[in-house]
From Swiss-Prot:
Keyword Repressor: no
Phylogenetic lineage: Bacteria, Bacillati, Mycoplasmatota, Mollicutes, Acholeplasmatales
Compartments, record wording: Cytoplasm
Record-listed N5-methylglutamine modification sites: Q232
PTM statement from Swiss-Prot or TrEMBL: Methylated by PrmC. Methylation increases the termination efficiency of RF1.
Presence of keyword Thylakoid: no
Official protein name in the record: Peptide chain release factor 1
MF terms in GO: translation release factor activity, codon specific
InterPro entries to which the protein is assigned, alphabetical: PCRF, Pep_chain_release_fac_I, Pep_chain_release_fac_I_sf, Prokaryotic/Mito_RF, RF-1
Family: Belongs to the prokaryotic/mitochondrial release factor family.
Major location (coarse): cytoplasm
Gene this protein is translated from: prfA
Length: 354
């Protein structure tokens, strides 16, 4: 690993030298991209080397009995212990930075939320989750575009599909896929009984044109009257669009746009993501990571997370994390959950790499 770090350091220095040469704009852009990827590793490695030098010097002084003052000697020994611990921490951080990255992590995502088991209460919870994700996206300065929205009675949502754009979005939101279980007293419950219901969240990496090629001859396009916010033309013109990909059997519809052209573009974005996800799932199936294990059917027993409102408690069952701050997290503070999930994933990868 040390040799690999030195190679990365040398590559970083070479790229810096390349910037001084008479490069084209496109070359400079690529160099800056590569530098930005390597910079966190190089900076941390430099900290590690500096700390290692300090540790070597103090160890040498202690071994050669160069310190005669007893009080200074005790301080030096404590300093050595502190530096040794810091060295271990930096080394583990470097190991994490060198772990293979998920190639999807830097992508935008399609986020889908559906009410599942529990009727209208499930749909109300789906609306609450949408609000949480919108607030989280706002805190990260991500752009959110609604592709499809199907409201239900009393302010609930039967389903919603969003396109979320920004930096490294999939690396954060990929942990949200699965069954989310809620335990609370519905507003309509006169006897105060706690009801359990679920919503399904699905997070798909957005597919780019270079990653997936779709022949329009394989797509059937249907138009129908929109029930969305299309102004006066709603229900009078066929602005809503349904795209059906015949080879895969995947069909998507979009009606949130104000024109047929806009809805067709949004539907195609959604269709690409679903086809791309199907391709990814085919690969994962070979590794026993089929999509159903990720998302499930919505049954209460398949939950990845439980939201207990009476006790203000949220539990992520994948890592056994329980927090008594449900109210805060539902205001968009999802990093309280997502960061421990990222840490757990990194630790698992470290164990696998040993």
């Amino acid at each position: 690993m040390l040799a690999r770090l030195k190679k990365i350091q040398q590559k970083y220095q070479n790229l810096q030298q390349d910037l001084l040469q008479n490069q084209s704009i496109s070359n400079k852009i690529n160099i800056f991209k590569n530098l930005s990827k390597l910079e966190p590793i190089v900076e941390l490695f430099q900290q590690y080397l500096t700390l290692e030098e300090q540790l070597t010097n103090i160890t040498k002084a202690l071994n050669q009995d160069q310190i005669e003052d007893k009080e200074i000697l005790e301080l030096a020994q404590k300093e050595k212990e502190t530096l040794s611990q810091q060295k271990k921490v930096l080394w583990n951080q470097l190991r994490i930075l060198l772990l293979p990255q998920d190639p999807e992590d830097q992508k935008n995502v399609i986020l889908e939320i559906k009410g599942a088991v529990g009727g209208n209460e499930a749909n109300l919870f789906a609306a609450d989750l949408l609000r949480t994700y919108m607030k989280y996206a706002e805190s990260k300065k991500w752009k959110v575009e609604i592709l499809n929205l199907h409201p239900s009675i009393k302010g609930g949502l039967s389903s919603v599909e969003l396109l979320i754009s920004g930096q490294n979005i999939y690396s954060f939101l990929k942990y949200e896929s699965g069954v989310h279980r809620v335990q609370r007293v519905p507003a309509t419950e006169v006897q105060g009984r706690i009801h359990t219901s679920t919503a399904i969240v699905l997070v798909l990496p957005e597919a780019k044109e270079v990653e997936i090629k779709i022949d329009w001859n394989d797509i059937r396009t249907d138009t129908f009257n929109s029930s969305g916010p299309g102004g006066q033309s709603v229900n009078t013109t066929k602005s809503a669009v349904r795209l059906s990909h015949l080879p895969s059997g995947i069909s998507v519809a979009c009606q949130e746009g104000k024109s047929q052209h806009e809805n067709k573009e949004k539907a195609f974005t959604l269709l690409k993501a679903r086809i791309y996800n199907q391709i990814l799932n085919a690969k994962q199936e070979a590794e026993n990571k089929h999509r159903k294990s990720l998302v499930g059917t919505g049954d209460r027993s398949e939950k990845i997370r439980t939201y207990n409102y009476p006790q203000n408690r949220i539990t992520d069952h994948r890592i056994g994390l329980t927090l008594q701050k449900l109210d805060i997290i539902m205001e968009g503070k999802l990093d309280f959950i997502i960061e421990p999930l990222i840490d757990a994933t990194q630790k698992e990868k470290l164990v696998q790499s040993e």
